[in-house]
């Protein structure tokens, strides 16, 4: 699908792709929360990464988080847990602090989840550098979407932003292979941050390199997402996805729609608590359903709804909602709080 290589079309593409990336058919959390099932489960199968991007904890604070890879037998237990949710989880997304392709068994993880239909859709976010002839065919036939984060347009730019030497031409060839073998169901989403395409020439090169390969191509603003992390790139691009000023968010939407399964089984209410401060359960000893409907989640949601987000970490210093989310529960907080209390009272009575 050939796209014109000019700034006007680039802007139009972004407006179109944002509907795919954020799903314009979104559930109104203000009217629906608390939900019976999480909409999204983030699956962190490893915390290892082959890059050290200058805006990431892997570069800024590499000694402040545990390195590890998820056990496959534990993953199968988690998948069994997912099947207990009614309605079914909308999306299982392989992502996390590490790059999923660093897990040598990642194709087995994906195949098992897809074969057992533990969610409605399956996605992976990756830098794509470890795509190869062995994993490309499997991922291309199982995933509903592969999201590739591009960090530069040549070897030198990758070194500038990720502190790693790569073979950019080989990387592009593997993306081309994936694009050719994937089925129609699978979308290849290629995105790059605006710091890497900060001129018209670079924007045109980005489209020239990847528009024919991608079903979706997107330039996103480079913003800070990690609590307590200060990048040396001066991340001041406004909102990650939309052209709108930052606004303070009192109630985090993430804790009403998602959970992350960390590599060691700890369950987090979101995907950016890289220091593992806000643990809501442990899937080694608890079911995901019990965690989702448990007292710890109720207390966390209640604190936010009561305007207490800034009284505890990492929520107090988290920039995710202001910089990256488009859902907002602030104006519906009182109504949601009443429904949360009703839900958990019913659970206690049952």
Task: For the regions a language model picked out, list residue spans one by one.
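Generic structural signal for small/hydrophobic residues in well-ordered secondary structure
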Residues: 41-45, 49-50, 71, 99, ...
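Conserved alpha-helical substructure of the radical SAM core
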Residues: 2-145, 157-161, 165, 169, ...
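Short loop/turn motifs at secondary-structure junctions and domain boundaries
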Residues: 35, 249-253
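C-terminal accessory region of radical SAM enzymes
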Residues: 173-176, 180-188, 210-250, 266-268, ...
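The −1 position to Zn-ligating cysteines in a subset of zinc-ribbon hairpins
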Residues: 48, 52, 251, 314
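Short, well-ordered alpha-helical microsegments
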Residues: 131-134, 199-200, 268
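Short, cysteine/histidine-rich loop/knuckle motifs that typically chelate Zn2+
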Residues: 55, 254, 317
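Conserved C-terminal portion of the radical SAM core fold
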Residues: 85-95, 114-115, 120-123, 142-152, ...
């Amino acid at each position: 699908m050939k796209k014109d290589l000019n700034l006007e079309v680039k802007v139009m593409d972004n407006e179109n792709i944002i509907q795919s990336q954020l799903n314009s058919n979104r559930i109104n959390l203000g009217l629906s929360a608390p939900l019976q099932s999480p909409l999204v489960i983030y699956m962190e199968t490893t915390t290892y990464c082959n890059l050290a991007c200058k805006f990431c904890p892997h570069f800024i604070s590499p000694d402040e988080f545990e390195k590890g890879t998820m056990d496959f037998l534990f993953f199968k237990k988690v998948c069994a847990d997912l099947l207990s949710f009614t309605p079914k989880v909308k999306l299982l997304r392989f992502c996390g602090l590490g790059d999923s392709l660093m897990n040598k068994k990642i194709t087995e993880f994906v195949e098992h989840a897809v074969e057992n239909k533990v969610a409605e859709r399956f996605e992976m976010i990756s830098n794509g550098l470890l795509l190869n002839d062995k994993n490309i065919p499997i991922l291309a036939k199982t995933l509903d979407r592969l999201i590739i984060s591009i960090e530069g347009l040549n070897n030198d730019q990758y070194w500038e932003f990720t502190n790693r030497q790569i073979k950019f031409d080989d990387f592009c060839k593997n993306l081309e292979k994936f694009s050719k073998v994937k089925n129609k169901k699978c979308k290849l989403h290629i995105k790059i941050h605006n710091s890497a395409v900060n001129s018209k020439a670079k924007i045109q090169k980005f489209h020239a390199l990847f528009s024919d390969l991608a079903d979706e191509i997107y330039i996103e603003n480079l913003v800070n997402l990690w609590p307590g992390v200060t990048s040396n790139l001066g991340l001041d691009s406004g909102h990650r996805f939309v052209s709108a000023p930052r606004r303070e968010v009192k109630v985090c939407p993430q804790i009403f729609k998602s959970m992350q399964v960390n590599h060691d089984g700890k369950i987090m209410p979101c995907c950016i608590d890289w220091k593992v401060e806000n643990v809501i359960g442990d899937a080694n000893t608890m079911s995901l359903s019990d965690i989702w409907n448990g007292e710890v989640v109720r207390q966390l949601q209640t604190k936010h709804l009561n305007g207490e987000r800034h009284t505890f970490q990492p929520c107090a210093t988290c920039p995710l909602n202001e910089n990256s989310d488009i859902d907002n529960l602030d104006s519906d907080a009182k109504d949601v709080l009443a429904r949360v209390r009703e839900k958990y009272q019913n659970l206690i009575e049952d």
